[in-house]
Swiss-Prot record:
The keyword Magnesium applies. One of its GO terms (biological process) is thiamine diphosphate biosynthetic process. HAMAP family: Thz_kinase. This is Hydroxyethylthiazole kinase. Substrate binds at residues 42, 191. It is an enzyme of class 2 (transferase). It comes from the Bacteria. ATP binds at residues 118, 164. Pfam families: HK. Catalyzes the phosphorylation of the hydroxyl group of 4-methyl-5-beta-hydroxyethylthiazole (THZ). GO terms for molecular function: ATP binding; hydroxyethylthiazole kinase activity; magnesium ion binding. Belongs to the Thz kinase family. SUPFAM superfamilies: Ribokinase-like.
Amino acid sequence: MFDFMTLEKVWEKGPLVHNITNIVVANDSANGLLAIGASPIMGSAKEEMDELAKMADVLVINIGTLDGELVTAMKIAGRAANVAGTPVVLDPVGVGATSYRRKVVQELLAEIQFTAIRGNAGELAAIAGEAWEAKGVDAGVGSADVLSIAEKVANEWSTVVIISGEVDVISDGTRFAKVANGSALLPRITGSGCLLSAVCGSFMAVQDDAFRASVEACASYAVASEYAEIELERKLPGSFRPQFLDALASWSVEKTRAKAKIQESGEHK
């Protein structure tokens, strides 16, 4: 099923990815999207949301650094994207960390139909209402089953769920996949998950099956990180960051197929 031709479609079509993202990761997200052949726009003024929704091929909403004006812009953009039939991705950064973040995410989920939600296990557990000890915006620890969390959120909100970790878990509520790739250096650079959300969005912009797009995006991204680590003389995050950008710029269907470790199942048992 996963032939990774979605990767080629991103190069061919150069989708316009509208990011309403946080101030920590905006530059890296934009550069990462450019590296894979997508076209980023980082507009966040509420006055331009309707126009941007008509232009963009996908909208990615990231709650990393919130304020009231930005939340208003997110809601306007999300509703406009729904009307336009544009895919919308939510990255609920640190949703379990504060009551304000939980409130904002619940409002966004109530007002916008998201094509996909991507976060770490702690963030998705918070959305699912499962017990989890979050550590700020990091995943933290918990005893809930990650597959069950993915299934619950996917079915409750009619969306694809992507839970990032040592093994990524992807589900649309009926289909499940695990991606067992990735460099250990990825979580040591800030914004690697935020960029993955944007990359998933770019794949959804050119592939109607959001589940397939998500699996192929996660695998391609993780494999690129492995190739980046191979090139390093010193396995350190400062060296890894630019090397990873280069790996994204030089990724290919053949490279990804050669290393991708995907386990797919039709149901969660």
